Amino acid sequence: QSSNRYFENCGERSLGQFLSVSFLVAYYILPQYFGIRLPGFDLTAQRMLITILCLFLLSKESRKKMFWEGVRSCRLWLFMAGYLGICFYTAVLRFHIGTFLYPFIELLGAFLVIYVLREYLGSDGFLVLFRRMLLFLCVLGLVEAVMRKTPFAYLETIRGLYTGGMIRSGSYRIMGPANHSLAYGLILISGLPLLCIDEEKHCFTLFRHLPLLLLVVVNVFLTGSRSTLAVMGLELLLLTVLAPGEQRKKLLFTIVPAGLLI
């Protein structure tokens, strides 16, 4: 009986890890126009995985308990509750359930990310997965720059959400899985600090994954977004300040002059 319980727990653990990885891949990589159109509601790939993961949580009391502990321990939940309250108030005034439902789904997705990171992947496992996803996006970004069309467009199953290519001053602006070049730029710069984490030394370093960092920088340039470039420059400066002493000096003598030239 104990051996059966052991294999059962191992099976549940493996299933949880598989769903966690699938959820994060869908959440970070797959476009919003990949899914199923239902009357009054688009069931995107992200929402499918959110639904499946929620059913997995609800199927066992211990998993529900761990999820709610993560929600309660989140320091931003008061601000999130206030935001949801405003959305609910707006939904009542507009008589449209989507005004409340869509922000609720986004917040639920954020809490699920916290849950799978704590319970199934851990910080090291999450960072390894994240770097692989970022590498995948950046390589496809280079392919898109050559094709002048995002490869994710071939996943369009919900018609009307894909906006097509973006061209400014004759130059094509890559957009990845997003619907706008600016949105893709935000995806890239939001992951930049995570890319520079050194798990072994527990510090920030720009040299830990330098080839991938350069790919991210090139992709940000190819988005053609000046605001995104400015934010990326600020991020690199802050990461330089947070780097170890000797590395900080080297970076200040290279990144700062390069930034001024750009």
Model regions and ranges:
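Alpha-helical transmembrane segments and terminal signal-anchor/GPI-anchor hydrophobic tails
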Residues: 38-43, 247-262
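Membrane-interfacial loop-to-transmembrane alpha-helix junctions, especially the N-terminal start
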Residues: 10-23, 66-80, 126-130, 205-209
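N-terminal signal-anchor transmembrane segment
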Residues: 1-63, 85-90
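Aromatic-anchored transmembrane helix interface
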Residues: 78-82, 95-119
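Juxtamembrane membrane-water interface segments that cap and precede transmembrane helices
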Residues: 29-39, 162-177
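Structural signal for the C-terminal ends of transmembrane alpha-helices
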Residues: 55-67, 92, 115-123, 194-202, ...
